[in-house]
Design a protein with these regions (language model features):
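Active-site phosphate-binding and catalytic loops of NTP-dependent enzymes
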Residues: 94, 117-126, 243, 379-382, ...
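Charged, surface-exposed helical/loop "interaction arms" that form contiguous linear patches used
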Residues: 357, 367-370, 417-418, 444-452, ...
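Amphipathic heptad-repeat alpha-helical coiled-coil/stalk segments that mediate oligomerization
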Residues: 207-212, 260, 271, 275, ...
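Short, small/acidic-rich helices and loops at N termini and domain boundaries
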Residues: 357, 837-841
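Charged catalytic and DNA/RNA-contacting regions of genome-maintenance
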Residues: 2-323, 332, 336-339, 343-349, ...
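Extended, charged coiled-coil "arm/hinge" scaffolds of SMC/Rad50-like chromosome-maintenance ATPases
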Residues: 487-525
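Short hinge/gating elements
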Residues: 59-70, 157, 213-219, 272, ...
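ATPase nucleotide-binding head domains, primarily ABC-like/P-loop NTPase cores
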Residues: 42-43, 222, 226, 292, ...
Length: 844
């Protein structure tokens, strides 16, 4: 049965209410609160039962047949929400907005929040070291405006991107946006690629939020930025019912201030996840992340995503790392303090979004507790950080919140004794009543002589005295007992005194829970008032944690401070790939990388498996680490500031489905060639291998020439086309280097050492031997190789002989005749005759 097929007039009042609410949330799965359960009906129920593996049942709704229904307990709803959201569904949470006990008739209900991939705020749903961004894209036909926010931290950004869909897509993937809001004029190809290739949630919306949250963008005047901001705000506030009071300001991201890296570069260099397993382990961020807080981990990732171009700011980070390296005891003491700091950024979001519980408040309090200690130590380091101690708020939380509060807010035991006089009095009443009831059982046993008498309690009948069937005869009417319930083996009684004490206890219990809840809301309001100050402190703590992490990494991995220069030189002595070195079981071989102002390109030849790709990645990683403000893995490093890095290393994912490997290779190469400047870095690994040999070699040579002649940026170009090594004779800015290997008695040892000059062997058959290819196959490969090498030598000799005896006589006659011709003074017939004469001369 489908929702749109039923006659609404026949539905029960509750189901009519459901239908009215569901009409406003057609795209969402509606969790409809009924008592202790969330229930799902019609298509939502069928879908949820399948996705969540729930039993699909039916519910009486006033119709002749039962409607499809399934449900989940309200107290354990989070795992179900997480499962649906991770599968790309949006969920609307409909709550009871009134207390059923105090309401006559239908309980008022309404949707209080919409949960989707991009707007999660519950910490247990989120990866602590990742931001959870939702974005908006507006297409202005000359440029894109990308606006993105992390509701869980209160970060909100806007930036302008060139009108290039690949660059837009690359930015969306780099930010790992979970949802994208697009206007209705958006390109359908972009929509399909985002949704189908990358599983990003897409919503089409062309509405803009006016006259709300203006304070967060009051200083922004650009009409394009404002449109992007209002577009995203409309979705968050109107569609998803988010309270964004924890967002202080929208930050404009100026892309030109940062080193640019497209999605291919970030993936090829394995900055955040490995190429093969798509895991964080063994990526660069895994190596560098020595942070103690979730906020610091996210900040470090942001620095790695956005390496700087301003030398002064970069050197400032170097100075802080040096200071920390010289103050080991202070650094370790701060790290111990940071370990006690919880995720203040996301806790602030929970304050605003209404999902804060007492344990969250306790985490805020425990975080604030260590701030004075951190502040004192930071002062001794002379770091310019704006960390407040929040002493007043800490004292309030220390006095108010119990050390072991319950998970939910309606269980009581939230507030400490001594915080509120009325609460203490109610607790005393409750305690006295419970104490009376606990002693009543003993006194009644003694008074009546009924040894198996007991005092019990249940929700329906309250407190009662229970007597077994065999002792009923001993009950005296003078005791004033009133029969309340008959069971198979016993009778239950109440007394006036018992009911009086019960009313006292239960009334006090109810008042205690209500008062504690209201006191907790007051505490939450006190936190709310300091929300922006807390967010500032959280941001400063994250910076401190991140820079300390880089200091720890510099000592653990023997990193050095690089020297940044305005000269166009790269001078790295004994450089290392930090991740490969860390996981390598053998001794890592370091290598120099030297390119003076007259050398733009290193043309790298050498055997397979010798380390060419690692050497290339190593340079890029050293540059990225240097520009994010980190020390680098080398004995010494002098580096310029780069504006962009482009890589084509190995197989890469296709942004637009359906392209061949070679086409993807060419598209990536074109991206580098078109967008690189003289201050960029290009890494091309065996370009041209995806097509026929001569085609590939021709393209590789043409690209190499183009870079050397037109772009003149620092480039590492590895190749197995040994014919290209002669280009250093044609272009003085190309230098040949090779990865050395030792050949002894038919065995090859890869030395992994970069040396000057070129080599003309790739040792492919040796690599096949290492791969345990069959001996018969290897023997045949050797035979074929010898034939090819022999033919190659003959061809070279033939070419040499041919070149020694050219006939230049006719050429010179032709040249002489051509010199005499005046094309503009010839008739068409004369021109044809002259062409015929030249052709005959050429035949001779």
């Amino acid at each position: 049965m489908k929702r749109n097929e039923v006659n609404r007039n026949e539905l029960s009042p509750m189901m009519k209410q459901y239908m009215e609410i569901k009409d406003n949330y057609e795209e969402e799965i509606l969790f409809f609160r009924l008592g202790d359960f969330y229930e799902l009906f019609f298509e939502d129920g069928i879908l949820a039962s399948r996705e969540l593996e729930l039993t699909l049942t039916g519910k009486n709704a006033g119709l002749k047949e039962r409607i499809p229904m399934c449900g989940v307990p309200f107290h354990s709803v989070k795992p179900y929400l997480e499962k649906l959201v991770n599968k790309g569904y949006k969920v609307a949470i409909c709550e009871q907005l009134e207390d059923p006990k105090s309401t006559k008739g239908m309980v008022k209900r309404g949707v209080v929040q919409v949960v989707s991939k991009g707007t999660l705020v519950d910490l247990e749903f989120l990866k602590e070291y990742d931001n959870n961004y939702i974005g908006s894209v507006l297409d202005f036909k000359t440029k894109y405006i990308l606006t993105y926010a992390d509701v869980s931290t209160g970060d909100f950004y806007v930036c302008e991107l060139p009108y290039n869909q690949d660059k837009l897509l690359s930015e969306i993937l780099n930010l790992n946006l979970k949802e994208v809001i697009l206007a209705d004029n958006s390109d359908t190809n972009l929509i399909n690629v985002l949704k189908n290739n990358y599983g990003i949630g897409i919503t089409i919306n062309s509405e803009y939020l006016e006259d709300s949250y203006e304070s967060i963008y009051k200083d922004i005047k650009d009409m394009y930025y404002l449109a992007g901001i209002k577009h995203l705000l409309y979705y968050l506030v109107i569609k998803e019912l988010k309270d964004l009071s924890h967002i202080k300001e929208v930050k404009i991201v100026t892309k030109d201030n940062y080193l640019s890296m497209d999605v291919h570069t970030i993936r090829n260099l394995e900055l955040f996840e490995t190429l093969r397993l798509k895991e964080r382990t063994y990526s660069l961020i895994w190596l560098l992340d020595k942070t103690k807080t979730a906020m610091g981990s996210r900040k470090l990732k942001y620095w790695l995503q956005n390496p700087l171009k301003d030398i002064e700011t970069i050197n400032s980070r170097y100075d802080q790392i040096e200071k920390l390296n010289n103050e080991f005891l202070i650094k370790e003491s701060i790290r111990n303090d940071l370990f006690e700091v919880y995720d203040l950024e996301r806790l602030c979001a929970k304050v605003i979004c209404g999902s804060l519980n007492a344990r969250d408040v306790l985490q805020i309090k425990n975080s604030l507790k260590v701030l004075p200690s951190i502040i004192d130590k930071v002062k001794s380091l002379n770091f310019n950080l704006n960390i407040s101690d929040h002493n007043t708020l800490y004292n309030l939380l220390e006095k108010a919140i119990n050390e072991n509060p319950p998970l939910t807010l309606k269980e009581g035991f939230l507030i400490k004794e001594g915080y509120n006089e009325e609460l203490d009095e109610l607790r005393s009443i409750r305690s006295g009543g419970k104490e009376f009831i606990s002693t009543l059982e003993a006194s009644e046993k003694e008074r009546t002589g009924i040894k198996n008498l007991r005092v019990g309690y249940n929700r329906i009948f309250g407190y009662y005295i229970e007597v077994s069937k065999g002792n009923i005869k001993d009950i005296d009417d003078s005791w004033g007992w009133e029969r309340r319930q008959t069971l198979t083996n016993c009778e239950r009684y109440i007394t006036p005194l018992l009911k009086e004490k019960e009313a006292l206890v239960l009334n006090a219990e109810e008042k205690i829970i209500e008062l504690e809840y209201n006191l907790f809301l007051e505490v939450k309001e006190a936190i709310k008032k300091e929300i922006f100050s807390l967010k500032t402190t959280a941001d400063e703590i994250s910076k401190l944690d991140a820079i300390i992490a880089l200091s720890v990494a510099s000592e653990e991995y023997n990193l050095v401070r690089p020297e940044l220069t305005t000269k166009n030189i790269v001078d790295i002595k004994e450089g290392r790939h930090p991740v490969v070195e860390r996981v390598s079981k053998s001794t890592y071989i370091s290598n120099d990388c030297v390119m003076d102002e007259n050398t733009d390109t290193l043309l790298i030849t050498g055997p397979n498996m010798s380390g060419k790709s690692t050497y290339m990645r190593q340079l890029a990683i050293i540059i990225i680490m240097a520009q994010m403000g980190s020390f680098v893995p080398a004995k010494s490093a002098i580096l310029p500031v780069f504006d962009k890095i482009f890589t084509r290393i190995g197989a890469s994912d296709d942004l637009v489905s359906g392209e061949s490997t070679f086409m993807v290779e060419m598209l990536e190469a074109r991206n580098a060639i078109v967008n690189a400047t003289s201050h960029s870095l290009i890494l091309f690994d065996e370009l041209g291998r995806g097509t026929a040999t001569y085609d590939g070699m021709s393209i590789a040579e043409a690209i190499l020439e183009y870079i050397s002649k037109n772009i003149k940026c620092k480039t590492l170009f590895s190749t197995h086309y040994h014919e290209l090594t002669s280009l250093d004779q044609k272009f003085s800015n190309i230098k040949n280097v090779h990865v050395s290997a030792l050949e002894e008695n038919g065995n090859i040892t890869f030395l992994h050492k970069i040396k000057d000059g070129a080599v003309d062997k790739s040792y492919g058959i040796h690599v096949a031997r290492l791969a345990k290819m069959p001996d018969e196959l290897l023997k045949r490969a050797d035979e074929i190789l010898k034939v090819y090498e022999s033919e190659s030598k003959v061809k070279k000799q033939e070419q040499f002989v041919f070149d020694l005896t050219p006939t230049k006589k006719e050429d010179s006659k032709i040249e002489q005749e051509l010199e005499k011709i005046e094309p503009l003074q010839m008739t068409p017939i004369e021109a044809i005759n002259k062409l015929y004469e030249l052709k005959q001369l050429l035949k001779k």
